[in-house]
């Protein structure tokens, strides 16, 4: 789309006039990508001025438009540097240049389209908002330096920001990105801020969230319903919050994307109290530490993990806790891992620094968890705070800059130098994934994919880009459904309304029910769960349309045959929206449905039953079950009443965790498998040389992985004695190796000429298994894809659904269910 030429131009924003020699040329450039809210127009202004070019730059809803005039060589250098020198937060996707007639110089400045200097023009609004919205990013080093510089006028200003840092996604209401279209519209700039805003030599030139102590926003502290006297002064508010935290209070802290609940990380009683208030169970809390040096004292952090911790995204990074780290056991019960993050907002930096003139020490580590009950959405509005924080927090460190779109913290692991996303949210969302390969150069319909039931995100496509939402959460409550609907409305208002929808084919998913209600006359594509996982992986790597084999291991997914899948080997060809199930884990009964998911001992008993192993009392899952429970399960399994056939690898991990007496009941999803991985990781080096465990996961001729021999071998090993070679950790490690061996064997058997393999699904958050499978497959000559952009768990599901729907729209003769 050609960008509009403005009908009138504002006064130039300070640049010297240049005479126009003969031989000049003029070009119109349209720049797309992440180019709004990142200081791109000021950058273009500085670049054009440096090269002695004239013209203008502006935003419309879909792009940055530029008209620039000067010598051809300078224009070429200008176009090249648009990419090479772009601002840190910008991502230039495409630059389209068109030669247009030159405009003669007008020394009097009377020609509105050709002033004698390069300048920024007003933004223009189009019907559809195609430009990507930038994510929120951490405060930059320059702003941190000013925050603690007594000579700077923004000294200790909790909302300091510039064009290179700060909130974007959470404050944008509409595009183009200008201050009136953000939540900063309520804070008129003071004269000094306005001067900086209009000065092209200033770092805050056209920085929309610009503010200072004179023009707000304001920070305050309160206990209960009453503000504490004098705490509307920044230092008094910070000092009061530090004091409350030191005394053992839980303090709600309003951040960029919502409220956190903060407390001392070293106080067992306080952490337990917070866990009780949130109804958290045993799921670990994240810990925010003062700086990287502090983080290194708490955990073993390599250079790659340090780079992610200090990146602009500032995610929570899962790292190995150091022995003796001053962290309460209740922070991450039974886990050697800590989820650490560094301060990313000015308020965080102030909270971790001593207040001038105060003798109160600043904290060095705080539990920092979303302000919500478990399984509810994060608290982020003033109304939310009034209604929900009273039961969760003793005090609130608050401010009056509204949050328009909530956004939880992101969570990652670092595997061999690369990020493995666990939760993609703040710092990453809503950056788009390029799915141009799915559109094949044609106009693709905008699709809304509603994701899954757990770890929900949704995805909206716009042309060749797929926009994945921030983390929404588990769709088990009315509050989360409302948050989902609100987030969908915000995204579609920023972009465009979908003409097609996609959902998981599970008939009981709330997301599917919602999509069916909302579809009206629009097509709704029901996408098989594991197929969506595989396509999301191919999409993020730009490998759509290539033949591939997907190893898709997770806990639960509705199969095309109505059974529970989760141990799948799928093949796709040139049509990625079609798949063939070429292998799987053998089915066992899932007794009691969700009850078996919450109680790994039930899955262990089901696998023992399927393997023909008697439930003797020396077996841990038998000992962990009551007589009544055993009778019920025996009746269900023998009669096949209340049982669904299940081929889930996640449930096999649960069963083995229970059989090895690791975990029989869970407080949160994946707990048993996570603890099994920890046990196996600690033993992996020693167990690697142990030839005597005899654990194998055999693969039949038709690509079925049979767990029965493995279960029999585990029981035999457990009963053979307690010598070093049959320790439980060694068996846990041997089980991981057996699964990896089976994966390599089945893929080699079914792949034929295909050399591309993807590892996806929530089970591949298990780094020990991920590495083992990847190593074995590479040894056999396969190219192996793993997730780097969206999570392998259900948080990445919506991207795959969206792509399948886009492809189905282009190939209406087919559907998304399996072939053959």
What is each of the regions a protein language model found here?
Residues 118-502, 506-518:
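Active-site-adjacent structural elements in enzyme catalytic cores
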Residues 250-265, 365-377, 554-564, 640-663, ...:
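Conserved phosphate/anionic-ligand binding catalytic regions in large, soluble enzymes, centered on
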Residues 543-610, 617, 638, 646-647, ...:
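Active-site histidine-anchored catalytic micro-motif
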Residues 530-553, 558-559, 600-609, 737, ...:
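Glycine-rich phosphate-binding/hydrolytic loop that grips phosphoryl groups
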Residues 504, 521-533, 756-760, 767, ...:
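Conserved phosphate-binding/catalytic loops in two-lobed NTP-binding clefts
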Residues 1-209, 213, 217-220:
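Intrinsically disordered, low-complexity, mixed-charge
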Residues 209, 216-217, 454-482, 486, ...:
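A contiguous, well-structured pocket-lining segment that forms one wall/lid of small-molecule binding clefts
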Residues 254-258, 503-506, 555, 649, ...:
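Glycine-rich beta-strand-to-loop/alpha-helix junction loops that act as flexible
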């Amino acid at each position: 789309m050609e960008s509009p030429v403005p009908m009138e131009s504002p006064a130039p924003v300070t640049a010297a006039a240049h005479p126009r020699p003969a031989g000049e040329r003029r070009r119109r450039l349209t720049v797309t990508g992440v180019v709004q809210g990142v200081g791109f127009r000021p950058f273009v202004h500085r670049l054009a001025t440096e090269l002695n070019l004239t013209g203008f730059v502006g935003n419309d809803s879909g792009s940055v438009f530029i008209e620039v005039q000067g010598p051809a060589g300078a224009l070429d250098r200008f176009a090249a540097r648009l990419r090479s020198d772009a601002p840190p937060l910008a991502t230039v996707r495409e630059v389209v240049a068109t030669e247009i007639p030159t405009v003669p110089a007008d020394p009097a400045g009377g020609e509105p389209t050709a002033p004698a200097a390069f300048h920024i023009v007003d933004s223009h609004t189009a019907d559809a908002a195609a430009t990507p919205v930038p994510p929120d990013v951490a405060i930059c080093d320059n702003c941190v330096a000013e925050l603690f510089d007594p000579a700077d006028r923004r000294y200790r200003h909790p909302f300091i920001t510039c064009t290179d840092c700060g909130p974007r996604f959470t404050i944008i209401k509409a595009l183009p990105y200008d201050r009136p279209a953000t939540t900063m519209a309520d804070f008129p700039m003071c004269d000094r801020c306005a001067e900086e805003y209009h000065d092209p030599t200033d770092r805050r030139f056209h920085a929309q969230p610009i503010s200072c102590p004179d023009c707000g926003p304001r920070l305050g502290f309160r206990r209960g319903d009453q503000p504490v006297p004098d705490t509307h002064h920044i230092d008094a508010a910070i000092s009061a919050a530090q004091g409350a935290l030191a005394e053992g209070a839980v303090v709600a802290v309003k951040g960029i994307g919502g409220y956190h609940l903060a407390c001392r990380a070293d106080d067992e009683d306080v952490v337990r109290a917070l866990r009780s208030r949130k109804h958290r169970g045993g799921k670990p809390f994240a810990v925010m530490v003062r700086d990287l040096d502090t983080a290194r004292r708490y955990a073993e952090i390599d250079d790659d993990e340090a780079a992610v911790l200090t990146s602009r995204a500032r995610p929570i990074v899962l790292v190995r806790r150091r022995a003796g780290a001053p962290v309460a056991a209740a922070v991450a019960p039974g886990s050697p891992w800590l989820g650490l993050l560094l301060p990313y907002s000015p308020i965080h930096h102030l909270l971790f620094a001593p207040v001038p003139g105060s003798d109160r020490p600043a904290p060095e580590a705080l539990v920092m968890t979303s302000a919500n009950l478990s399984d509810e959405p994060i608290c982020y509005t003033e109304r939310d705070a009034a209604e929900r924080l009273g039961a969760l927090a003793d005090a609130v460190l608050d401010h009056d800059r509204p949050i328009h779109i909530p956004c939880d913290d992101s969570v990652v692991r670092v595997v061999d130098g690369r990020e493995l996303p666990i939760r993609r949210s703040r710092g990453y969302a809503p950056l788009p994934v390029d799915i141009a390969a799915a559109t094949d150069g044609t106009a693709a319909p905008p699709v809304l994919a509603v994701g899954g039931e757990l770890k929900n995100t949704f995805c909206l496509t716009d042309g060749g880009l797929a926009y994945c939402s921030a983390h929404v959460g588990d769709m088990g409550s009315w509050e989360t459904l409302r948050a989902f609907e609100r987030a969908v409305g915000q995204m579609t208002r920023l972009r465009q309304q979908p003409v097609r929808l996609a959902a998981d084919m599970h008939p009981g998913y709330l997301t599917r029910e919602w999509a069916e209600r909302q579809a009206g006359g629009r097509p709704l594509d029901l996408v098989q769960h594991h197929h969506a996982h595989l396509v999301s992986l191919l999409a993020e790597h730009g490998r759509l349309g290539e033949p591939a084999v997907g190893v898709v291991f997770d806990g639960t997914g509705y199969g095309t045959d109505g059974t529970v899948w989760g141990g799948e080997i799928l093949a796709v060809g040139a049509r990625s929206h079609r798949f063939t199930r070429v292998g799987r884990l053998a089915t066992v009964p899932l007794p009691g449905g969700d009850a078996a998911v919450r109680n790994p001992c039930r899955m262990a008993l089901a696998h023992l039953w399927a393997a023909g192993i008697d439930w003797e009392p020396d077996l841990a899952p038998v000992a962990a079950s009551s007589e009544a429970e055993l009778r019920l399960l025996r009746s269900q399994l023998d009669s096949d009443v209340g049982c669904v056939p299940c081929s889930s690898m996640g449930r096999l991990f649960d069963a083995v965790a229970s059989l090895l007496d690791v975990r029989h009941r869970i407080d949160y999803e994946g707990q048993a498998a996570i603890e099994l991985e920890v046990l196996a990781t600690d033993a992996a080096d020693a167990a690697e040389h142990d030839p005597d465990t005899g654990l194998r996961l055999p693969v039949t001729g038709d690509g079925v992985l049979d767990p029965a021999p493995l279960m029999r071998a585990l029981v035999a090993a457990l009963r053979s004695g307690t010598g070093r070679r049959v320790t439980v950790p060694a068996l846990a490690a041997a089980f991981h190796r057996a699964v990896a061996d089976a994966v390599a064997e089945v893929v080699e058997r079914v792949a034929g000429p295909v050399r591309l393999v993807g590892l996806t699904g929530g089970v591949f958050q298990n780094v020990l298994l991920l590495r083992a499978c990847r190593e074995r497959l590479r040894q056999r000559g396969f190219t192996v894809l793993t997730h780097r952009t969206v999570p392998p768990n259900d948080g990445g599901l919506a991207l795959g659904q969206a792509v399948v729907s886009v492809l189905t729209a282009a190939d209406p003769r087919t559907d998304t269910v399996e072939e053959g």
